[in-house]
Regions:
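N-terminal polybasic/positive-inside topogenic patches
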Residues: 13-18
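Cysteine-nucleophile amide-bond enzymes
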Residues: 5, 19-230
Length: 230
């Protein structure tokens, strides 16, 4: 009931955009800095506000696509995989800074982009995380390796190969922060992940699980212990 109330009065769907009478669809790009070990390393090297990029094809962000940790928690195995706002690192790191952007594309480009992303998810065993490419990207050195992608390279490849947009530089050199500078993208939200409207809507709509209750209790006890020490 709370979920339906929130969605009706606070989560307003965007009007479908048009350009010169042509119906357009929207691809969403979510930038985050989760504070994981890899995120901290990238942040230490680049100083970028955001260290991870994901993409979605629905405004509720029910499913995000990227090249990242496959099980949602541990760093490896990694490669093209789906992410969820209420699972894995996104669930544990509600205080992570994030920004949500919208890119309006033609119906044809939208279909091609979604099809390409889904294909890579379905054939996930063929793809790997581009660890060396990520390191070289931070040093502004191009490194293309077949079927290997880091997060922003994955998003860039899907957008470029589908004809959704033209990139200002090679996909292997695209940083998550670069998307925040693109004039084609419209910023819909900037703040902490826990306050993202789509994340809030999910939390209102889900029933608490034994694991979530247990994690909540453990976090509460840990915070109480820290207060006693200091």
């Amino acid at each position: 009931m709370l979920y339906l109330f929130y969605k009706k009065y606070f989560f307003r769907p965007l009007r479908r955009p048009t350009y010169k009478g042509i119906a357009m669809k929207t691809i969403y790009i979510l930038l985050t800095r989760s504070g994981t070990l890899l995120s901290k390393l990238v942040y230490a090297v680049t100083g970028a506000s955001y260290t991870h990029a994901s993409m979605a094809f629905d405004e509720e962000l029910n499913c995000l696509y990227s090249s990242t940790r496959k099980n949602g928690y541990t760093m490896f195995p990694a490669g093209p995989s789906k992410e969820y706002l209420n699972k894995g690192v996104f669930r544990l790191r509600g205080d992570a800074p994030c920004a949500l952007y919208a890119l309006d594309v033609t119906d044809e480009a939208y279909v091609r982009a979604r099809r390409r992303a889904e294909h890579m998810m379905a054939r996930g065993e063929l793809y790997r995380f581009n660890t060396l490419g990520l390191i070289l990207c931070a040093l502004h050195i191009r490194w293309q390796r077949r079927r290997h992608y880091f997060c922003s390279q994955f998003v860039s490849e899907v957008l470029e190969k589908s004809g959704a947009m033209e990139l200002p530089k090679d996909s292997t050199l695209m940083h998550p922060n670069d998307y925040a500078q693109l004039p084609q993208l419209k910023c819909l939200y900037e703040g902490c992940l826990a306050d993202l409207p789509q994340r809030k809507a999910m939390e209102l709509g889900e029933a608490p699980t034994v694991v979530s209750v247990y994690l909540g209790l453990m976090l509460g006890l840990a915070k109480a212990g820290v207060r006693k020490i200091f």
